[in-house]
């Protein structure tokens, strides 16, 4: 069986924005084995895409791709290269799809929406992809808090973390409206979630997907949790900064994006000034307009 190897050794949001490209590869290679090189913790969600047969553990670009079989096709869904492309070349693929500087390669476009970028890459090589094909299969486990409003104060970088005391104010307002409010967190974010003043839920990745899929509303920054809301069509209020939503935000659907403009360092340690300009009142108002009605007692 031929192997198609796709590299996207990044985070949760990166995996989810890459779904249309992965599904396009699946349609183009229906009988081949699609292998995704990605962090091993993402394997359970990769399986929910319905496009991936196996995950090759690859937490970054610091080690070679440990492939057992020479791929018939290697696809760089990771970045513009050269490191990521060189890793794929080292597997000696029969063909390689990647951005590059040569006249025969598609060119990287700064500021392009992340979903569109990888769809365009594949289209250059004759593989059509649908940028709207972002849905994810629902996981088997039930939600740990069905019908709740989910606030997620964490983010991979401090520059994308809206202050936790503001999340606490939003939680208090929505709880007063009659909603069950929970604060979700990763393993290292329990103290941050506890400061929201709501019930803390610390799910694993599959449970997190179930939590978001069954939520009445998600409120978070520019994080993978927001992309889960997009994947499941869950209403969301997304607080953007310092990266603009034109590059990473949802398009259409029951999602409200708050963004005050201005770019900054998406990997910085301190909250972005633009993110700090989003007031509590605006988030509460957006949440009240977006939230599904609270469940009957």
Residue ranges and their predicted role:
Residues 1-297:
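Catalytic machinery of carbohydrate-active enzymes
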